Amino acid sequence: RLRRPSVKNRYFSVDWLGMGSSVLSWKLVDHPKLPKGKTVAVVVLDGWGEANPDKYNCIHTARTPTMDSLKTGAPEKWRLVRAHGTAVGLPTEDDMGNSEVGHNALGAGRIYAQGAKLVDLALASGKIYDGEGFKYIQECFEKGTLHLIGLLSDGGVHSRLDQLQLLLKGASEHGAKRIRVHVLTDGRDVIDGTSVGFVETLENDLANLRQKGVDAQIASGGGRMFVTMDRYENDWDVVKRGWDAQVLGEAPNKFHSAVEAVKKLREVPKANDQYLPPFVIVDENGQAVGPIVDGDAVVTFNFRADRMVMLAKALEYENFDKFDRVRFPKIRYAGMLQYDGELKLPSHYLVSPPEIERTSGEYLVHNGIRTFACSETVKFGHVTFFWNGNRSGCFDPKLEEYVEIPSDVGITFNVQPKMKALEIGEKARDAILSGKFDQVRVNIPNGDMVGHTGDVEATVVACEAADRAVKMILDAIEHVGGIYLVTADHGNAEDMVKRNKSGQPLLDKQGNVQILTSHTLQPVPVAIGGPGLAPGVRFRNDLPNGGLANVAATFINLHGFEAPADYETTLIEVVDN
């Protein structure tokens, strides 16, 4: 046998030993029935699920002729897939999908245990306390304070209260003598107004720790969208407000207890848990009870990465110019997980992240597929970093182009609900018409970002703008004889109201419907078509429980290749006419 040259990449080194050897190859097998060379548009509508039609289903209410035509025009080329729970690696069927795990599944073509599940396993087994990350922060327990910063909620999208409770218990049992919690109120992944109950629950837990001799209390707080939890460097002032309260112990609002703080701040007209201003807890002398100082340990306990990265940079980077930190305490900092594998950020973490290798993007680049990916700032990371298995940057800059359109800053998205949908559509259209790319991949964020505001009218406008962007892309595909695949990452805009078990809208004490600002458990559509789609291609009917992870094999087929053997099964079949 001839010995072939070694192929090296960042995951492994493989020696080709000829036929019959069980080595892993990047080379994809040609599909027996589907041609190569067609331009494929992959469109992800963020927060676009399928639900019963009523006035709180903004997708149904909106004028969306393009998406409507995909649903009704070709029944064998439109179906629903699961985008929540175990289908995307989350622990239970009650776990809403989110954009991170959704894009991981779409890009990876396989289901990986995700953040929350990894943390659950580490806490349940106690392995979290044996890991390098915990041992790193544990060295501060004797003389310093352990600070825990994160979202106080049981929403399960960024964090979970029960995980914080277990971490508090475990840390105190492993030597933490002084603990300060810096809480961020939710109102986005859970109902607005629930912050008071979560704070009361936490205060009760901390009181129990104090009875056991641990000096434990809440030190600061604020609403998640106004304090700390910005993402993609959209607005560093959000992080600075958190830094001032958490590290410097400074905020415009000072209270003697967190329950008092949240109750008082919610009395302001139109107050919302998401946007509560920063506050610090002070003692009887007016001194902050828990600023972060030299010798302390800090843990950010969110398991989801995107809204922790900016704070992680502020806590970890010696050279930092995004705002004046005033002082940079010498601390030991660990994330619940590593939030960015490429930046190695943070450098210490309590639970190792899912190792996602051999994503569809990497396979396609190895097979010469020229790729264009685009979204606006708020979802750019999803169509690149998360799609590529939590990996920053291109696999091959010669074959890939990633374009980020700056998102609006300084406003909530219901003020400009069209966002940058048309600009994304234009960029995708131009990329398709240029002939330079084989795959054009976009995320259109409107349904999710505006849906999160709870503004029903604005969300309708958002869905209409998204539909127009899809039309621009599909028109370009028509022009070049290409193929489209349109899907979504999870639900949101299709159900904007909290419901009882029989599906009726829930009312508050004043008789108003309770608006739902979170994601949903609804399935999402997948539609295929275009003049380049080979005759006889249709969705299979033997995969009723198909999920987002099945989509990767599907578009790999549309490029004219068989998917890797370990990928979730393709959604399509080719029937001989």
Give residue ranges: language-model regions.
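Feature captures the catalytic ectodomains and active-site-proximal regions of enzymes
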Residues: 10-577
